[in-house]
UniProtKB/Swiss-Prot annotation:
This is Large ribosomal subunit protein uL29. GO terms for biological process: translation. GO terms for molecular function: structural constituent of ribosome. GO terms for cellular component: ribonucleoprotein complex; ribosome. It comes from Pyrococcus abyssi (strain GE5 / Orsay). InterPro entries: Ribosomal_uL29, Ribosomal_uL29_CS, Ribosomal_uL29_sf. Signal peptide: none annotated. Keywords: Ribonucleoprotein, Ribosomal protein. Belongs to the universal ribosomal protein uL29 family. HAMAP family: Ribosomal_uL29 (MF_00374).
Length: 68
């Protein structure tokens, strides 16, 4: 996800996307633990980065709201 896409989302939408990505990350890690080879090993890394991006922008939005 691009930061510009995330900034257009509301905080509720960001929270929903974070939950969705965390669930997907748990599934991917579970597959890895069970010994299943992943189609794309970069999936886990990309999921972690997307979650971090979402959390960062969410925090920025919350700070802006508190200042107002």
């Amino acid at each position: 996800m691009k930061p510009s896409e995330i900034r257009e989302m509301s905080i509720e939408e960001i929270d929903a996307k974070i939950r969705e990505l965390r669930l997907q990350l748990a599934k991917e890690r579970g597959m890895l633990t069970m010994g299943t080879s992943l189609e794309n090993p970069m999936v886990i890394r990309n999921l972690r980065r997307d979650i971090a991006r979402l959390l960062t922008i969410k925090r920025e939005k919350l700070r802006e709201m508190r200042k107002k």
